[in-house]
Structure formats: C-alpha cells, structure tokens
C-alpha cells in the first residue's frame, strides 16, 4: 500500500493520486459521539513503572494507544507486561502502533510482540497514532464493548488501516 501523505511535519504534503476518494458524493456526516477516555503511552528507553502505572490507572480510561519501537517492540520486563495484562483484564483496550514515520506493527515477528499479544494488546498495524486514537474514541463513543472495539480495530472502517492478508479471518 502506498502512503497518501508524502511528507508530514508542521505542514502536510499530500500525494494527491493516492488520496481516498469515496464512491458516493453524499454530504459529510460528522460524528459527534466520541468518547475521550483514551490516552497515549509513548514508550522510551528506561520508561519507569510509575509512568506506565500513572497512565494505565487514569480514572475512566477505556483505551490506550501505545507507541512502540520498530515493528511493535516494547520492553519485556515482567512489571511492564503485568501492568498491561492487568489493564486489559480491567477492560482497557491497548492498541500497539509504531513510533516510526512509516511501517507497520508486526506482533508475530519478534518475541516481544508475542508477549504483548499474550498480555492482550491489539495490533494497530499501520495506523497512525492519531488514527488509532480517533478510531477508539469513535468506537467507544458508539457504546461498543472492549471485545467489540478490539474486533473493529482489526478491520478497516474507511481505509484508515491496512490489514495484512495473512491476518484477515
């Protein structure tokens, strides 16, 4: 899949031939049912248990977009994986996206990805952080359960994510 955005930063340069054009010319229908109980957990070398715990224990939190390294790698320390699992067990949906400017999360590629899957983390594939946050806000805003949200995170609603053929049910 080619990227629609050629370059991003303060200014966005679009690769216009790649921009999604809907088949229908219906008027824009904004969605206002958004749940803002979402957080971003940006991983960095040496992240402490206190930082992770403070984010995962935000009152009312429903979803976390976790920015990982490379193709979805994260620390493998027991405290970290336990905190993620405990949050998932409480019904918090954790979505794994890459911090890289391009690329995709491949949780089956490395041992760290397998451990995240075991903890209940959901792949964001090639979603951007912003796209994953918005999608979580939309899905929770429409009253979906955590399991339903996870299921919808594994499919493209409007072209916001590329799901590998090998992953599709």
Predicted features by range, described:
Residues 68-169:
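C-terminal non-catalytic interaction/assembly regions of soluble proteins
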């Amino acid at each position: 899949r080619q990227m629609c955005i050629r370059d991003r930063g303060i200014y966005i340069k679009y690769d216009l031939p790649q921009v999604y054009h809907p088949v229908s010319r219906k008027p824009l229908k904004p969605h206002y049912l958004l749940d803002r109980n979402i957080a971003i957990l940006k991983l960095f070398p040496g992240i402490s248990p206190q930082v992770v715990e403070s984010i995962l224990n935000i009152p009312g939190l429903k979803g976390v977009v976790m920015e990982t390294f490379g193709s979805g790698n994260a620390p493998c320390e027991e405290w970290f994986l336990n905190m993620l699992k405990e949050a998932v067990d409480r019904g918090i949906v954790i979505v794994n996206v890459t911090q890289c400017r391009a690329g995709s999360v491949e949780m089956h590629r490395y041992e760290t990805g397998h451990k995240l899957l075991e903890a209940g983390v959901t792949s964001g594939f090639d979603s951007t952080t912003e796209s994953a946050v918005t999608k979580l806000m939309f899905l929770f805003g429409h009253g979906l359960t955590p399991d339903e949200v996870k299921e919808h995170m594994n499919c493209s609603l409007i072209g916001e994510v590329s799901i590998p053929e090998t992953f599709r049910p």
